[in-house]
UniProtKB/Swiss-Prot annotation:
The active site is at C111, C210. The keyword Disulfide bond applies. ATP binds at A16, M17, S18, G19, G20, V21, D22, S23, L42, G135. Keywords: ATP-binding, Cytoplasm, Disulfide bond, Nucleotide-binding, RNA-binding, Transferase, tRNA processing, tRNA-binding. It comes from Streptomyces coelicolor (strain ATCC BAA-471 / A3(2) / M145). This is tRNA-specific 2-thiouridylase MnmA.
Length: 376
């Protein structure tokens, strides 16, 4: 477990336990390291589907029971905290509003920013806890001058620093990631859970948006925003088909387009632009998705903000690769230029900047510039 100044003595640690294997092993490691650990499961959903057997996500009653059983095996106190109202306001309503505006949000990143390391952390500190522990794969590393840095996990294949890139210095000072500094496969984590007697050792990972129980994002949005039929057009404005709500699409999407005829060249079409004002979805060839620059707003820095232009690597989606960029903060907006064109960048997603393995900061993508023409 990576050390910080506060980690040199036993801490009172609140372990966020989702009911999955990663958070259970993280809590067990924190307890084994000598910390005074208390487990907590966050009740985040008022959706009745979350209470049915087999519901997917990480907010179900079964997950709460799994977390409690794991805490019992570890030998730590356990509580369930109801943060459903805060989660609905800060994550679910934001998710719907962003899609309605033609953007593609990342609810996991938003949850880390507003729930796990804000609502949960604030309550933990008020109750006298020193740190919040989660099962994320990332590292908080202490420099010689006492500054804490957020770094990628030792195992790049499982690194989750992207969804933690919104954390600021205060939040990092109270963050603990016991899984981040070990190079182990998921099978090894499961084997460790089994050795510890944790029943979640064989529990499948959840890859769905936790508050959409059936995994149907378009249906979830339609229930809240209603159907709004509009046109699907090509770049010349020719009508190719219709949709039931522009909010149901994202930049780069290929599947689910209701287009009756193929492109003249026979190649697939992709979503290039979403106009909530006109309720229009524009489609075109894959190469039209290439962008060479973007503007990003609401920057958050893990440490001091850069004082001038710099060269970094950037990650644009949770499971995406790295790309080299030139970035500069101009009047509070992050101006980014790619060394090579990047395909399918969606406004609303986060760009996270890295200096080696260190997270420099993040911002929300507001607009992009096509590699061949004007703004996307």
């Amino acid at each position: 477990m990576t050390e910080t100044p506060q980690r040199t003595r036993p801490l009172r640690v609140l372990a966020a336990m989702s009911g999955g294997v990663d958070s259970a092993v993280a809590a067990a490691r924190a307890a084994e390291a000598g910390h005074d650990v208390t487990g907590v499961h966050l009740a985040l959903s008022a959706n009745p589907q979350s209470f049915r057997t087999g519901a997917r996500g990480c907010c179900t009653i079964e997950d709460s029971r799994d977390a409690r059983r794991a805490a019992d095996v570890i030998g730590i106190p356990f509580y369930v905290w109801d943060l459903a109202d805060r989660f609905r306001e800060d994550v679910v309503e934001d998710f719907v509003a962003e899609y309605e505006a033609g953007r593609t949000p990342n609810p996991c990143l938003r949850c880390n920013e507003k729930i796990k390391f804000a609502a949960l952390l604030d309550k933990a500190l008020a109750l006298g806890f020193d740190a919040v522990c989660t099962g994320h794969y990332a590292q908080v590393i202490l420099r010689e001058d006492g500054v804490r840095e957020l770094h990628r996990a030792s195992d790049m294949a499982k690194d989750q620093s992207y969804v933690l890139g919104v954390l600021d210095d205060r939040q990092l000072a109270h963050a603990m990631f016991p899984l981040g500094d070990t190079v182990t496969t998921k099978d090894e984590i499961r084997a460790e859970a089994e050795r510890r007697g944790l029943a979640v050792a064989k529990k499948p990972d959840s890859h769905d948006i936790c508050f959409i129980a059936d995994g149907n994002t378009q249906g979830f949005l339609a229930d809240r925003l209603g159907k709004a039929e509009g046109d699907i057009v090509d770049e010349a404005g020719n009508r190719l088909g219709t949709h039931e709500g522009a909010y149901g699409y994202t930049i780069g999407q290929r599947k689910g387009l209701r287009i009756g005829t193929p492109a003249p060249d026979g190649k697939p079409r992709y979503v290039l632009d979403i106009s909530p004002v006109n309720n229009t979805v524009t489609v075109g060839p894959a190469e039209a998705l290439d962008v060479d620059a973007l503007r990003a707003i609401k920057p958050r820095w893990c440490g001091a903000a850069p004082t001038g232009p710099g060269t970094y690597t950037a990650q644009l989606r949770a499971h995406g690769g790295e790309t080299e960029v030139r970035a500069e903060l101009v009047d509070g907006t992050l101006e980014v230029t790619f060394s090579e064109p990047v395909r399918g960048v969606a406004p609303g997603q986060a760009i996270v900047l890295y200096d080696g393995t260190r997270v420099v900061g993040s911002a929300t993508i507001a607009s992009t510039t096509r590699a061949t023409a004007g703004a996307a």
